[in-house]
Amino acid sequence: MMWELLKLRTVLLLALSTVSAAQAGQTEVPDELGAMTLDARVDESVMGINDKLVKWRRDLHAHPELSNREFRTAEVIAAHLRKLGMTVTTDVAHTGVVGYLRGRSEHPLVALRSDMDALPVTEQVDLAFASTVKGEYLGQEVGVMHACGHDNHMAMLMGAAEVLAGMADEIPGSIKFIFQPAEEGPPEGEQGGAKLMVKEGVLQDVDAIFGLHVFPSALGTVQYRTGGIMASSDTFKIKVKGRQTHGAVPWGGVDPIVVAAQIVLGLQTIPSRQLDSTLTPSIVTIGKIQGGVRSNIIPDDVEMLGDRKSVV
């Protein structure tokens, strides 16, 4: 958990420094002496909740929930924020939770954000807190796992809430804690995620916002840059329509599986041959192919689900 503590500490320092600087009308962080004092206090507070961070993260990891279905997760988070004396709003963008910590003044208002949802992935490790949860995704029963680190993010933001709540009387501003559902995308036919949270006004009056994502980088490092740092993602569906026939007489129909295979290979030439990868990093992935019911019957159609990521 040491890397989680380090990143939690970074978020806390960013939030407190931003509030202090904005309150003073500055564009830079507070003076060096003040920053050192803040640094030491945050270090002490963060180390004091180490055991809680481990407990929260393992509990959340053992009970993952899919997008727009984060019901237990929301209850755990809301109960924690209420225990800290915050004003808590639930059911934001379906299952989102927002906590408000009033400091010495309403503004500057700095927001800290975490995602909440898990992925339709079966966990394959033998740990006491490994997920055994099953869920439904695209009409199929699937394993559910926090395979993208959102359990870490939630534990860190719960920790940030606890530390900052203990310093509320000294914060020259206020803090909003945003727990966002459906970061992985809402179920088909539903709204959700960041867009719905913004639509419902979660960022109203917010002066600055911070978020992070865990990454398998060197311990004790934080990566950042001006502008975009994470890739944007768009999903797509392709349906190839053929004509059913027996596998013994493929010339009697149109084989959509062969066509689908050509499409999969052809798509890979877009990022590798049509885009300058030194200027426009991009990836195209086909994550699901579904078609046919028997080994010797050429089906009528094949459906593919894919994802493209690009840095803009």
Each model region followed by its residue ranges:
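Hydrophobic beta-strand positions in extracellular immunoglobulin-like domains
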Residues: 101, 240-242, 308
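N-terminal secretory signal peptides that target proteins for export/translocation
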Residues: 1-6
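Boundary at the C-terminal end of the N-terminal hydrophobic targeting segment
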Residues: 21-27
